[in-house]
Amino acid sequence: EDLVDFIGPPLLESFQKYYQLDDAQGHMALKKYRERFKDIGIFENGVYPGIHTLLSDLKKQGRSIALATSKPEVYARRILDKYELMPYFDVVVGSEMDGRRTDKGEVITEALRQLQVADGQRQEVLMIGDRLHDMIGAGKNHVDKLGVYYGYAHEGELEEAGADYTVCTVEELYDFFKAH
């Protein structure tokens, strides 16, 4: 539970903020973290029950699905492959290992570019996220924001960050899509 605040924002930013590290120390902490994460930590996670069905149904409805993550894209793709989620995604965008594109707004901008979403089509886009950085990044891109509380958000965090909608379970998310 002490590490929940590290989930969502760029890790370098979190290391510097919570441990008062300077730039060099922050990069060293990030390097050490990635040494363990690339082989072990990367798969210390799982898929919420119901997500496979939800994604499958959304694809059957003809919806485009993108993953926009602050996690390095190379790791995001490995995780999606491991849990057999990659076929559901039209676009996967993450940060670069060299530190480029770590801001969530930039990640979402790139996902929208790859999806070929024109400015006039952004009202058709919904960003789903479980941390305030997701809501802020979506706001920078002028897309609707749905916050999920079955992730890592603290109570009230998503609304304070501008979520247009919130749900507490995968079932509620499924119901949201049935209604929209």
Predicted regions and their residues:
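A metal-dependent, Asp-based hydrolase signature
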Residues: I7-D39, P49-D57
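Short, acidic loop-to-helix structural element flanking the phosphoryl-transfer center
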Residues: D39-L67, E73-R77
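Surface-exposed amphipathic alpha-helices with a cationic face
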Residues: H52-K59, L112, M135-K140
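Conserved H-loop
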Residues: M86-D90, A118, D164
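A short, structured active-site edge motif that brings together acidic residues
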Residues: M86-R101, E124
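Conserved Lys-Pro-Asp/Glu-containing loop-to-beta segment of HAD-superfamily phosphomonoesterases
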Residues: K104-M135
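Acidic, Mg2+-coordinating phosphoryl-transfer loop and its flanking beta/alpha structural elements
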Residues: M127-C168
